[in-house]
Amino acid sequence: MARPDAALLDPARYPFAHQITTRFADVDPNQHLNNVALAAMMEDARVRFNLAMGSAVKIGERRAMVASVAMEYLSQGHFPDPVTVHCAVERVGNSSWTVIQLLAQHGRPVAFARSALVAIADDRPTPIAGDYRPVLEQWSLRA
């Protein structure tokens, strides 16, 4: 994945933000926040974003499954300062949607992630429910 477009690095464009306390255990031998710890922070924020959208584990008879996650590490993050993960829906398709996330510390971009989520029923992709599509669009990236 190439470095994200500069417009995607503006926290004001994201409708959801979640602050995470960093832990000493998140630090690696290079004295910065470990890449695996950053991925876990993105995961935590993505789940909280889904909950904020009102989509717990099930969406009616459908479930949402993560199909892919791609992450770019943009700069170093450091303990003990907290990080903020900003989340938005980037795209809504027929049976899937894309969530983008910006992890920042002191307003400085540290990491960017793009995740594809798929609506699943009977272990197969299924169209996004009609009443859920407006919810996804409401949480879209701001212009």
Where are these regions (language model features)?
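HotDog/MaoC-like acyl-thioester-processing domains
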Residues: 1-18, 73, 77-79, 90-143
